[in-house]
Amino acid sequence: MSEQNSTEMAFQIQRIYTKDISFEAPNAPQVFQQEWQPEVKLDLDTASSQLADEVYEVVLRVTVTATLGEETAFLCEVQQAGIFSVAGIEGTQLAHCLGAYCPNILFPYARECITSLVSRGTFPQLNLAPVNFDALFMNYLQQQAEGEGAAPHQDA
C-alpha cells in the first residue's frame, strides 16, 4: 500500500451571512422630483481573518453611491461575510482562495441585498454587473510586487 498525502486539499462553506447593512437617502424626498440620470459609483473591498486552524472569515464590503449632480441620491453599503474551511493549501494559493475565490462566492449575496435595499428605497432597479475578483487579485499581487501594500480594492 502506498502512503497517502496527509495534506489533502479541502474547501467547505460553513456559513454565509450579512454582517452589516446601511442604506441612506439623505436628499429624499426632493431627489424623487428630479430626472433620474444618476452617476453610480461602486466600491469593493475584501478582508479576511483566521478564526481557527483552517477556518477563515472573509468579508466583502460593497458600497454603492448614486449621485444626481452634486446631491447624493442614495448610499448603500453591505458587508457580506462567510466562514470557510480551507485545508491543504498555503501561501499564494491560500491568499487567492481568500482574496478571489471566496469573494466570488459572496458577491451574488451582496448584490441581491443591495438590489433589495435600493428597491425598498423606491429607487429604480439597480443591476450590478459581475465582478472579476481573480483580475482584482492579480492587480493586488502586481501592486504588492511593485511595493504598494494596499488591500484588494476596486472603484468602478
UniProtKB/Swiss-Prot annotation:
UniProt keyword annotation of Cytoplasm present: yes
Coiled coil: none
Keyword terms: Chaperone, Cytoplasm, Protein transport, Translocation, Transport
A GO term, aspect molecular function: unfolded protein binding
GO biological process: protein folding; protein tetramerization; protein transport
CDD domains per UniProt: Translocase_SecB
Predominant place of localization: cytoplasm
Highest rank taxon of the organism: Bacteria
SUPFAM superfamilies per the UniProt record, alphabetical: SecB-like
One term under GO cellular component: cytoplasm
Family: Belongs to the SecB family.
PANTHER family: PROTEIN-EXPORT PROTEIN SECB, PTHR36918
Name of this protein: Protein-export protein SecB
Species, as recorded: Serratia marcescens
